[in-house]
Amino acid sequence: MKRFYKTAFFSEIGSEEVSHFWADTMSSHSPLEQFSILPLIPMNIGNLYFSFTNSSLFMLLTLSLVLLLVNFVTKKGGGNLVPNAWQSLVELIYDFVLNLVNEQIGGLSGNVKQKFFPCILVTFTFLLFCNLQGMIPYSFTVTSHFLITLGLSFSIFIGITIVGFQRNGLHFLSFLLPAGVPLPLAPFLVLLELISYCFRALSLGIRLFANMMAGHSLVKILSGFAWTMLCMNDLFYFIGDLGPLFIVLALTGLELGVAILQAYVFTILICIYLNDAINLH
């Protein structure tokens, strides 16, 4: 009976009105709506517009959470000689990143590697917690925005380039010209290597942004589809809803893995690029 009234209603208003109806319905529940940056505290300085947004809020919350967690598990902040669960988690992250730095960066003594370790540890921890808090309902995924990931990747990439010049001087430019290249091909290879080197920073930011945005969008689409079928008040639709519901649960678990994996991939690529800049590989 409900389907009959729906069919009669749509036949009376016409196909054009139906298309507008569904367009308005879908636009109000767009899967990209979760990535909207909303100003919380608007600020104007002359012709420049600044504002404290939801993205800024969740970045501050992530940093605060990391600082509180580290302070809590240290001895000064109340850590125990016998580690509890939180202390074990921080030690696990610390040892994981330390082993990553020791394995991927060669040609340096342990003391010199320790100079790079804090930056790499903070980067991994920040990205890990940003990705994980984006899985919480009604939160905001900071790493799903291209400008944020691109700003992070370019700032780290500039720092790696500076380290390369500090360690090797102008000999660092030999990284752009492989040994044994014929002289006529040298200008073309230098240009190609320079473009490839600069695109490292771009690909580093795009990879993180694209994976986080695509995964969250897919979960949102399937969640909306499952919820729509669940609200149909029909046994057929309810049974058909179980399939999308299980897929949503599986994708949520997959997204948790992707959140951890992307923080790892971002960090290991930083170590590889830093090793290339130091050892000119």
From Swiss-Prot:
It comes from Oenothera berteroana. The chain crosses the membrane at residues 50-70, 116-136, 145-165, 172-192, 219-239, 246-266. Keywords: ATP synthesis, CF(0), Hydrogen ion transport, Ion transport, Membrane, Mitochondrion, Mitochondrion inner membrane, Transmembrane, Transmembrane helix, Transport. The gene is ATP6. PANTHER family: ATP SYNTHASE SUBUNIT A. This is ATP synthase subunit a. Belongs to the ATPase A chain family. One of its GO terms (cellular component) is proton-transporting ATP synthase complex. GO terms for molecular function: proton-transporting ATP synthase activity, rotational mechanism. The keyword Mitochondrion applies. The keyword Ion transport applies. NCBIfam families: ATP_synt_6_or_A (TIGR01131), PRK05815.2-4 (NF004482). It holds the Pfam family ATP-synt_A. InterPro entries: ATP_synth_F0_asu (IPR000568), ATP_synth_F0_asu_AS (IPR023011), ATP_synth_F0_asu_bact/mt (IPR045083), F0_ATP_A_sf (IPR035908). F-type ATPases have 2 components, CF(1) - the catalytic core - and CF(0) - the membrane proton channel. CF(1) has five subunits: alpha(3), beta(3), gamma(1), delta(1), epsilon(1). CF(0) has three main subunits: a, b and c. It comes from the Eukaryota. It is a multi-pass membrane protein. It is found in: Mitochondrion inner membrane. Mitochondrial membrane ATP synthase (F(1)F(0) ATP synthase or Complex V) produces ATP from ADP in the presence of a proton gradient across the membrane which is generated by electron transport complexes of the respiratory chain. F-type ATPases consist of two structural domains, F(1) - containing the extramembraneous catalytic core and F(0) - containing the membrane proton channel, linked together by a central stalk and a peripheral stalk. During catalysis, ATP synthesis in the catalytic domain of F(1) is coupled via a rotary mechanism of the central stalk subunits to proton translocation.
